[in-house]
Structures are given as structure tokens and as C-alpha cells.
Amino acid sequence: VSGQGEFHLRTLKWRIGNNEKLMVEFQEPRIPYRETITKAARADYRHKKQSGGAGQFGEVHLIIEPYYEGMPAPESYKFGNQEFKMNVRDTQTIDLDWGGKLVFVNCIVGGAIDARFLPAILKGLMDRMEQGPLTGSYARDVRVCVYDGKMHPVDSNEISFRLAGRNAFSEAFKNAGPKILEPVYDVEVLVPSDK
């Protein structure tokens, strides 16, 4: 069903309801916003939960920045008077279903976090990319460098690192100059020619 405005749509709703005896519902259209960031930011998050037996523990330190195609590998970041040198171990580029990319860079040195927990951290990041920290819209074009963290020999598990990664990402995203991207559509207008 289409119309030239709200009046036309209400008239159609009335006609369908009265003539065809069908119930028609109107819903507000959901605008497909996207979220992204404009500058680099750093965050760390410790997920710690203790309840009787084995608890949960995972700590993630990360830096996020805007991503663009052809961007060089990160070497160092400076925040205030602190400089962070990056030793890139591995890079994963993920093409997002909703457009854009997430680049996940492993810069962990010295076994601060076992490699077996990196997929869990990535899942936590994807949780937040699918439901952005600002409006709940999809986030896009972000590079995340995980450079440090802590684990516990007994209490660390995948869920702990998934939650730590997700919450560290949210915190960093909010400090990275977040912005909302509005959709742009191609529109073709056809009009009859006057002869």
C-alpha cells in the first residue's frame, strides 16, 4: 500500500476496514541508522563475579579507532602523556552483513590472555556492533586492537571474556566521538513529458 501522504494512507485504511472488513495496523517506519566513531579511544574492563565455587574473571584492554580501506597496521597510540606500542600478532577483517567492516587486531604479548579466549572477545565485540552503544543501530567501520588483559587460572572462561570485551568496547565507543549515520537512498523520479 502506498500513498502521497498521511491523509491518503488513512483514507486507504478506512476503505479497507469498511469495505473489505480487514483490520489494518499502522506502524512508525524504522529508520536504518548506523553508528560509527570519529577518533581513537582506549578502555579496559574487568568482569569479575564470585559465587561460591568457580567464579568468572576476564579483563580486556583495547583501543578502538575509525577504520578506512588501505589503513596501515597500527604501530603505536598516544593518549595524554601515555604511549602504547602495538606488536601486531594477527589481524582479522570481518565484512559486516549490514555494510562496513570490523577489523580485529590481536596485539597481546606475553600471554596476558590465552589465544583460546580471543574468539570470545570477538563475539563480545560483535554483540555491540550488532546493537550499537548509542541508539542500538548497527555499528560499522571500526578497528579494535586488543593489547592487554588479565586472566585467572580457574575462574577465566569464554563468557567472562565475551562480557569483558563487549563492555570495554561500549566504554571506548562512547569516548571515541561517536556519531549516527543517516541512510542515503538513490531515488529516480519519472514525470510525463509535456508535448
What are these regions (language model features)?
Residues 1-195:
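Accessory interaction regions appended to the cores of large information-processing enzymes
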